[in-house]
């Protein structure tokens, strides 16, 4: 048996090729799986469950069917932090806290989206703190739909522009934040996404940090079993 981890698909109506690739993944990669974990940024942007796009609603129906035979877990990312219970219920997904510990075939593991580890990005961490307040999210949800969409588009545009000017170091995780989370959770393994830099990092103390990749040019899935871990790339169908 095996457990699968994915993240940073950034699904949108503008990139239906990614949705197609994800559906193919759901068709071909879930055999003998114990569970599927989605580590945030399933969608490129999410302004509210009441504004879910048709392709997202169709995906929810697909995931709901799969959830009848396979548990699907979801952790919020920085792009879909407004995704709520209405959608997760429709998709059959179980929402997890942003930092969750679990036992993976005898290995204590902490899973998260990963944006909280990029502590050198001070501007983003300020925004992250603001949107962590339930009142701020509630206030945003009370705005008219058109206003919410406009704000989301503005934030997305500013983020893309800002990221182009940030250094490689600032955009990556801060080692001290990684060490602190290992110490806080007492786990031996960490799995996250967000940075779009898929890799397996082994530490001298026996700990392991695994980063799942994004789905912009190809798919990425981490397969964990009793035999170990396998970080796989999934080429998109050229057709």
Curated annotation (Swiss-Prot):
Assigned GO CC terms: cytoplasm; extrinsic component of plasma membrane
| Pfam families assigned | Metallophos
Reactions mediated catalytically: UDP-2-N,3-O-bis[(3R)-3-hydroxytetradecanoyl]-alpha-D-glucosamine + H2O = 2-N,3-O-bis[(3R)-3-hydroxytetradecanoyl]-alpha-D-glucosaminyl 1-phosphate + UMP + 2 H(+)
Q: Which domain of life is it from?
A: Bacteria
Under which EC number(s) is this enzyme classified? 3.6.1.54
Query: Quick one: which residues bind substrate?
Result: 78-79, 121, 159, 163, 166, 194
The Gene Ontology terms for molecular function here are: manganese ion binding; UDP-2,3-diacylglucosamine hydrolase activity
Single Gene Ontology BP annotation: lipid A biosynthetic process
PANTHER family (UniProt xref): UDP-2,3-DIACYLGLUCOSAMINE HYDROLASE, UDP-2,3-DIACYLGLUCOSAMINE HYDROLASE-RELATED
So what family is this one in? Answer: Belongs to the LpxH family.
Biological role: Hydrolyzes the pyrophosphate bond of UDP-2,3-diacylglucosamine to yield 2,3-diacylglucosamine 1-phosphate (lipid X) and UMP by catalyzing the attack of water at the alpha-P atom. Involved in the biosynthesis of lipid A, a phosphorylated glycolipid that anchors the lipopolysaccharide to the outer membrane of the cell.
The protein here is known as: UDP-2,3-diacylglucosamine hydrolase
């Amino acid at each position: 048996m095996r457990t699968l981890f994915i993240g940073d698909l950034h699904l949108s109506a503008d990139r239906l090729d990614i949705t197609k690739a994800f559906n193919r993944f759901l068709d071909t990669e879930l055999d003998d799986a114990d569970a599927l974990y989605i580590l945030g940024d399933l969608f490129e942007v999410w302004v509210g469950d009441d504004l879910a796009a048709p392709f997202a609603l169709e995906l929810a129906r697909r995931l709901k069917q799969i959830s009848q035979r396979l548990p699907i877990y979801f952790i919020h990312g920085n792009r879909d932090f407004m995704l709520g219970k209405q959608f997760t219920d429709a998709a059959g997904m179980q929402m997890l806290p942003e930092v969750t510990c679990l036992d993976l075939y005898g290995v204590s593991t902490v899973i998260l989206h990963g944006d909280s580890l990029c502590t050198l990005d001070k501007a983003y961490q300020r925004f992250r703190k603001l949107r962590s307040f339930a009142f701020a999210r509630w206030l945003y949800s009370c705005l008219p739909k058109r206003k919410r969409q406009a704000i989301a588009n503005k934030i997305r545009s500013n983020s893309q522009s800002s990221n182009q000017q940030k250094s490689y170091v600032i955009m990556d995780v801060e080692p001290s934040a990684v060490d602190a989370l290992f110490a806080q959770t007492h786990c031996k393994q960490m799995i996250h996404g967000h940075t779009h830099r898929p890799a397996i990092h082994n530490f001298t103390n026996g700990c392991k940090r695994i980063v799942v990749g994004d789905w912009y040019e190809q798919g990425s899935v981490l397969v964990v079993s009793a035999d170990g871990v396998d970080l796989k790339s999934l080429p998109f169908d050229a057709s």
